[in-house]
């Protein structure tokens, strides 16, 4: 980054004054602009109130005389303001020169201001009789005062906001107005057909024409209800009541649409403003993160911003007597700032510059001093922090005072940067990164209570979804009947799907398996005894093989088909009956 400095702060030029005046009048920001424009609005409002009072007989004399002097003051004030606005517009390039001023004067609000000023001057010069206005002049003054109310909103923000809301919701507004207009003309026509021959109590026909019916329809569907025209027959009243409910509902919809549109527009502006505050914080975070990454890069371009270009007037060794260290440091700092075009006491945006004390070749390495002084670090927030001067030496301080001080030499090349310089720069960059990260996190926080509530509701909804999913899996694991099972199946298996019932079935199956294993063991023993040719229950010969304990006589029921091993379906389907475990 290359910083360009000026010798001193420039004086206020003509264009600068024009710019400040133009921003004050045309782009009001701040409490001073608010006070000024609000005072102008109050003056115009008071003048309008006096013009209203001039129509009341009790206050004619007081209001007319006061209104005369107020009009003179307002004409002079608005005329002067118009000239100042025309002059200050020259700060912008498109309004420079005569043609630029004419372009500024062709703006609608400028035309209205000019008309008000000229018309007020004409009324004051022609329509006044002494210190009061004529009756015809007062009528013109009232109209001009109404036009002055447009002066309050010179930027047209109100009209732009209304236009944007109408444009966004144009489809809904067109639909409601179209349907409401159809309801109006149909209701008016049917009421006219029913009431065209009806006579009221005074003997007059209220709905003598279709125009009278349309007037009644407009007054009815807009919920004004003057009561000047009322249906007389029951047929007309029935038609009017039916169509009124339908038409009034559609004529009331545009108000709700515009209200919701304004609310959404305000919320959108707040979100955009909150997002705009995040952009500088994000850019600063990206910049500091990149600088931290670049600090690990050995390329010279990373460190060039900390190197000061050499000056011609700078000499390493001065033949003059060396001043004391404190005086020398102050003069050196003033000289370096002056060389860079920075006046004393002026805060500018710079990068840290590093200076060091040159080491003489004759001096031994054991006796050297490194002075990292005058490294003024100025952050982007224009806060100047001057580092202290560290002196490292293993000699006595008195010897240094006797020997004098070596003038500090700014680092003019990347190769002169030492390891402690690079380490310091890395630490500073790391600190700047953490500060930028904290600011970005603060900028990301919700700006409104509604956003906090919305985030809480969204988090609560996600939590409930996860809880329901966990409950579903738990029900599936413990055997709870699903939602798609019919009511009859639920009532049939109400007690068999609990954990206790399932454990009981498992225990029953284990007992059945134990009995089957006992039967299988008996069958194997019987088969083994028959294989050796002995009577059932006799011992086999001891010529080898396993010794089998004798058992009782052969049970013929063991070989029945019913004693076969149970199938998978028999093990899974529970038996119902008192002898299930036998």
UniProtKB/Swiss-Prot annotation:
Q: Where is this region: C-terminal assembly domain (tetramerization)?
A: 500-531
Q: Which parts of the chain does the record assign to the membrane side Cytoplasmic?
A: 1-31, 88-103, 154-171, 260-582
Show the catalytic activity: K(+)(in) = K(+)(out)
The region called Interaction with KCNE1 C-terminus is annotated at: 446-483
Write out the annotated subcellular location. Cell membrane; Cytoplasmic vesicle membrane; Early endosome; Membrane raft
Q: Which GO terms describe its cellular component?
A: basolateral plasma membrane; cytoplasm; cytoplasmic vesicle membrane; early endosome; endoplasmic reticulum; membrane; membrane raft; monoatomic ion channel complex
- Modified positions (Phosphoserine) are 318, 320
**What Pfam families does the record tag this protein with?**
Ion_trans, KCNQ_channel
* Activity regulation annotation text: PIP2 molecule is essential to activate KCNQ channels by inducing the coupling of the voltage-sensing domain (VSD) and the pore-forming domain (PD). Upon channel activation, PIP2 disrupts the VSD-calmodulin/CALM interactions, causing the release of CALM from the VSD which triggers the opening of the gate. Calcium potentiates KCNQ1 channel current through calcium-bound CALM. Calcium-bound CALM competes with PIP2 to stabilize the channel open state.
What residue spans carry the region label Disordered? 530-582
Question: Which positions bind a 1,2-diacyl-sn-glycero-3-phospho-(1D-myo-inositol-4,5-bisphosphate)?
Answer: 155
Q: List all annotated glycosylation positions.
A: 200
- Protein name per Swiss-Prot or TrEMBL: Potassium voltage-gated channel subfamily KQT member 1
Keyword Transmembrane among record annotations: yes
From the record, what ranges are coiled-coil? 496-532
Pull the Extracellular topological domain ranges from the record.
54-64, 130-137, 195-210, 232-233
Q: Belongs to which family? A: Belongs to the potassium channel family. KQT (TC 1.A.1.15) subfamily. Kv7.1/KCNQ1 sub-subfamily.
Q: Does the keyword Endoplasmic reticulum apply?
A: yes
- What broad class describes the main subcellular location of this protein? membrane
Organism, by scientific name, is Felis catus
> What are the protein's UniProt keywords?
Calmodulin-binding, Cell membrane, Coiled coil, Cytoplasmic vesicle, Endoplasmic reticulum, Endosome, Glycoprotein, Ion channel, Ion transport, Membrane, Phosphoprotein, Potassium, Potassium channel, Potassium transport, Transmembrane, Transmembrane helix, Transport, Ubl conjugation, Voltage-gated channel
